[in-house]
Amino acid sequence: MNIKTPSTPNNVDQQEIEKFEAIASRWWDLEGEFQPLHRINPLRLNYILQRSGGIFGKKVLDVGCGGGILSESMAREGADVTGLDMGTEPLQVARLHALETGIPVTYVQETVESHAEKYPQAYDIVTCMEMLEHVPDPQSVVHACAQLVKPGGHVFFSTINRNKKAWLMAVIGAEYILKMVPKGTHDAKKFIRPSELIGWIDRTSLREKHIIGLHYNPLTDKFSLGHNVDVNYMLHSQYV
């Protein structure tokens, strides 16, 4: 099956890059701006492990890796991990933290589209978590991820649904009321409906295998997974 060539080789929003560069030094501060990422990471990792059948000894690419939270956790599970990002400061933080912990992760500053041209079908697993809503052309990212994975391999995406409830919870609630993330972290116009993401996936060699919601309960201050995908969700696809 043919995979569409990515149409946006320089698929970068400089304002988004600068936004995360400004707070990159606090990426591994468990009480800082990235606390939610640290708290949901076990849920993300377990989902990847369960749906892929395990990642030990597998070649994994983490697209939009930022400071390396997910990348390091996958490397701890025995995967050969490459983290990909366009932010200079987040990658410096990621490399330093990997040196401090002794966890081997290879970090590369490059767009996923460029990486796909160099390394087609090079990875057993590709993850693209909380990244699609921060680029000008998310469909191009999906196509590139499809190019990068081997036949039979797995690609995982996570993003935010686009509807009024998601705007209220992910922007108004998380940024302005609960102050879980900095104001301006999200642009609701860039949120992505599951039907849109699945449509992009269906135009590649990938097929959607499973979708699940990621929920936050402000009363219990707990994150959990569930069937409701109204706000945050994760999607598992496979090269078939």
Curated annotation (Swiss-Prot):
Keyword Iron-sulfur: no
SUPFAM superfamilies: S-adenosyl-L-methionine-dependent methyltransferases (SSF53335)
EC code(s) of this entry: 2.1.1.222, 2.1.1.64
Domain of life of the organism encoding this protein: Bacteria
Top enzyme category: transferase
Keywords: Methyltransferase, S-adenosyl-L-methionine, Transferase, Ubiquinone biosynthesis
Pathway(s) where this gene product acts: Cofactor biosynthesis; ubiquinone biosynthesis
Catalysed transformations (reactions): a 3-demethylubiquinol + S-adenosyl-L-methionine = a ubiquinol + S-adenosyl-L-homocysteine + H(+); a 3-(all-trans-polyprenyl)benzene-1,2-diol + S-adenosyl-L-methionine = a 2-methoxy-6-(all-trans-polyprenyl)phenol + S-adenosyl-L-homocysteine + H(+)
GO MF terms, alphabetically ordered: 2-polyprenyl-6-hydroxyphenol methylase activity; 3-demethylubiquinol 3-O-methyltransferase activity; polyprenyldihydroxybenzoate methyltransferase activity
Classification via InterPro entries: SAM-dependent_MTases_sf (IPR029063), UbiG_MeTrfase (IPR010233)
GO biological process entries: methylation
Pfam family membership, one: Methyltransf_23
List of residues binding S-adenosyl-L-methionine: R44, G64, D85, M129
Record-linked NCBIfam families: UbiG
Entry's family note: Belongs to the methyltransferase superfamily. UbiG/COQ3 family.
Function in brief: O-methyltransferase that catalyzes the 2 O-methylation steps in the ubiquinone biosynthetic pathway.
UniProt protein name: Ubiquinone biosynthesis O-methyltransferase
Species annotation: Photorhabdus laumondii subsp. laumondii (strain DSM 15139 / CIP 105565 / TT01)
